[in-house]
Amino acid sequence: MRKFSCFVSAMLAGAAWMAAQSKPNVIVVLADDLGFGDVSAYGSKTISTPNIDRLARGGVCFNNAYATSATSTPSRYALMTGMYPWKNPDAKILPGDAPLIIREDEFTLPKMMREAGYATGAIGKWHLGMGKGKINWNETVKPGANQIGFDYSCLIAATNDRVPTVYIENGDVVGLDKNDPIEVDYEKNFPGEPTAIDNPEMLRMKWHHGHNNSIVNGIPRIGFMKGGTAARWRDEDMADYFVGKVKDYITAHADAPFFLYYGLHEPHVPRAPHERFAGSTTMGPRGDAIVEADWCVGQLIDHLEKEGILDNTMIIFSSDNGPVLQDGYYDEAVKKVGDHSPTGGRRGGKYSLFDGGTHIPLFVYWKGHIAPLNSDEFVCQMDLLPSLAKMVGGKVPAGLDGIETLDAFMGKGASNRKDLVIEAKSKVAFRTGPWVMIPPYKGKARNVTGNELGNLKEYALFNLVDDPAQLTNVADKYPEVLEDLKKRLAAQTDGKIVNN
């Protein structure tokens, strides 16, 4: 009888394990400012990204995938909520001490996955705010990722060029000495603290614009910071640190379905890849940082294989927005770009309404379940939330802007997305079929980075199939198309943000 009981217990345990494994693990890897043309799977001859290419060539490689926005915070907001970021006035590029812009009662991707039976983790770059304002970094900071659906988090609050330059695990600063408390201010410096303007002799990286406040590791940052010396990261070690956290998370959850959001910090500025990657390319620190990002992806894949769960893990790789070369530091990115096109020949880049701002790399890989496919289907990152919900049996509320299009993501059918409102710095454009329509906007043609912004004096209509570089405005040639797109954009935005 005892043997029979043990046998039954073993059978039940095995059945439970099989039930858990019937749902695939899901990992979303989101690079930072990585362009469509920066990945060798899309034809780059200058930079080799074999690990990212493994995902592209072993899964669905999308040629027509988009972020909602041409900058970080709004793009990430859309991914997490399935909602257009221009509907949230706080979804703009955030300082490092900004409050959380996702309400605690708001529906999110990690909440959906958790309710579907998944463990949920967030590791790497966050940039969606933390706390409620006036953050005390010396206590547990909340609300944050753990309050909007993640069981576990280990993050940087904003970007690697913004203070505080510390890791935050489940709301607590890692390695903080309470006798050396952290203070952060985005308006004024703390008495006696060095800055890039006052102490240029302390710099090992020269600032170009904006990055002239506190100095950490010889690198000037945005914002002022005091204290927390023992907790401050070394920029060159950041990739290794987060790869270690990713491996630990995977190992700890290898026997149950998990959802992991892995926010890479590369190739965002300051570009300070580990010394072992220095000189990996002819393009300086930006190229080397992309090689480091590719290494991170390789480490992820290898660890999934080591744990024996690669076949049961869907990996989704993308970037938050388009690329930028000169984004605040003199690091030779412009000088050494050569004939490499980070946007893959698209006009604009980060911050831009032109196609280079939101046309991003996107690959969906699931070994043994997704056949390799080069797809021209039109998809958006915010479509992942309802699509993953369908795959894992999750529930979503009515009214999401994301569209369920699982068949397209799996490479088994056409996309259900017909159009998209693209946003850049609170200005919008409208994308549908081969067309993109950009309303006229006031403002400079280029910002300080050198990227074109899409501020045009007249309505512009481009056919991206015939003219992917957007060199020819065909609004006069196709007036009926222009009028249709103008009406559709006004209807979707209630006419509130057109022609700001």
For each feature predicted by the language model, list its residue ranges:
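Formylglycine-dependent sulfatase
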Residues: R2-F4, A19-A460, P468-N500
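Hydrophobic h-region of N-terminal signal peptides that target proteins for export
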Residues: A10-A19
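Cysteine-centered catalytic environments shared across enzyme families
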Residues: S5, S9
